[in-house]
């Protein structure tokens, strides 16, 4: 994967990362969060809604990454299973590729996605949901970064800390 090539092929990637598999292979400097949303085909009855309530998902099949690699997704799954059993969950691979988005468009299922991916597929509409789930994004870099990468990361941390004293 490209993640394991950090430090060889390139110094940095910027991306969403809550993956235990990825974080075993790289460092991450968090820069912010993206909200978890739902995507549906343009023909789906929910596609016309400006915002979804969780109850709008009752009776739907929600496609989401399989359990075990993402604490954010695992938390959503646990909450839905416990509090909203009327939502059926279908596992997808841990990392979405175009086949996952195509499957959502073709099946009429609902896909758990991110606000930053709202325009990723022309056949899907991404809709905010009335919940507070999000996933961090940030600067991904090698577990053994060279000195110039370390200096850059320290400089970014310093800038972030000066703008937000609560930044760690």
Segments the model singles out, each with a brief description of its role:
Residues 24-36, 40-62, 150:
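Flexible hinge/capping segments at coil-to-helix
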Residues 22, 59-84:
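Secondary-structure junction motif
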Residues 1-21:
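Central regulatory/effector-binding core of bacterial HTH transcription factors
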Residues 23-29, 33-34, 98-147:
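Beta-alpha-beta core module
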Residues 18, 67, 116:
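Flexible loop residues that form catalytic
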Residues 55-59, 135-168:
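Extended ligand-binding regions for polar small-molecule ligands
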Residues 1, 65, 85-97:
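Short beta-strand-to-loop elements that line the ligand-binding cleft
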């Amino acid at each position: 994967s490209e993640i394991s090539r950090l430090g060889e092929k390139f110094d940095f990637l910027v991306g969403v990362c809550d993956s235990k598999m990825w974080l075993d292979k790289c460092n991450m400097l968090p820069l912010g969060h993206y909200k978890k949303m739902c995507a549906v085909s343009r023909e789906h009855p929910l596609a016309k809604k400006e915002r979804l309530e969780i109850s709008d998902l009752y009776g739907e099949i929600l496609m989401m990454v399989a359990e075990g690699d993402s604490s954010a997704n695992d938390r959503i799954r646990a909450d839905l299973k416990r509090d909203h059993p009327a939502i059926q969950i279908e596992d997808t691979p841990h990392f979405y590729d175009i086949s996952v988005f195509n499957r959502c468009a073709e099946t009429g299922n609902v896909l758990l996605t991110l606000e930053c991916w709202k325009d990723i597929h022309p056949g899907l509409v991404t809709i905010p949901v009335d919940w507070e789930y999000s996933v961090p994004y940030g600067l991904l870099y090698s577990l053994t970064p060279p000195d110039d990468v370390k200096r850059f990361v320290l400089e970014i941390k310093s800038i972030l800390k000066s703008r937000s004293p609560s930044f760690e």
